Amino acid sequence: TSYGNRGGTYPGEGAREVANNKVFFWDMCKQKGVSYRTYGEFVSDGKPTLAVLQDNYCRDFTGWDESVRDTVRFYQWKRDFDSLLAINAVPRFNTVRFINDHTQGLSLGRPTPFAHVADNDLALGMFVDYLSHSPIWNETLIISVEDDAQNGPDHVDANRSVALLAGGFVKQGFVDHTPYTTTSLLRTMELVLGLPPMTQYDAAANSLWRCFNTASGHPPYRYR
């Protein structure tokens, strides 16, 4: 009903308490002593929607507001990251949301879908560039997925979308044709962080092990 503008509220991101349990990924991190931080994800009106994020979110990072460019969000993240890096306190698990791949369609007075996606792509490139020049690059894994795969279904399969990996141990110039799911990404993050599976679904999922080298040391990335 929300999607069709017939009433209702957005059901995700902690908006409905009845749907929330205690097994979000952040809850598992907290239980196992893995530090974490969120930038925009599960944050509404400048406040986290889950108690587990209360002291683990960036207050200066803009949440869901499509009037704000993702390149602006990059600089918001950068300031916070630099402050944490300076005191050796960068959390092990971070979620960063650049939203403008979602676009606003052909809404009057708003940037075109091409402009929104270009802004989103540039912000992601700046993000990878900056991390790749940081002292923690060889210990970093970036997993990037689309919020929604826009502009219609994929030309091969409507269930298919893009996933990008970057990091010191990630193979360069490698295209993996293994049929992964979003749960595969979740399983990979669990293995990297030393977390147990949260459900039978991620326990049974294929991890992205084919995408990694046994040694790190890639040159820094530069966006263009």
Language-model-detected regions and their locations in the chain:
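N-terminal pro-sequences and low-complexity stem/linker regions of secreted or lumenal proteins
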Residues: 1-224
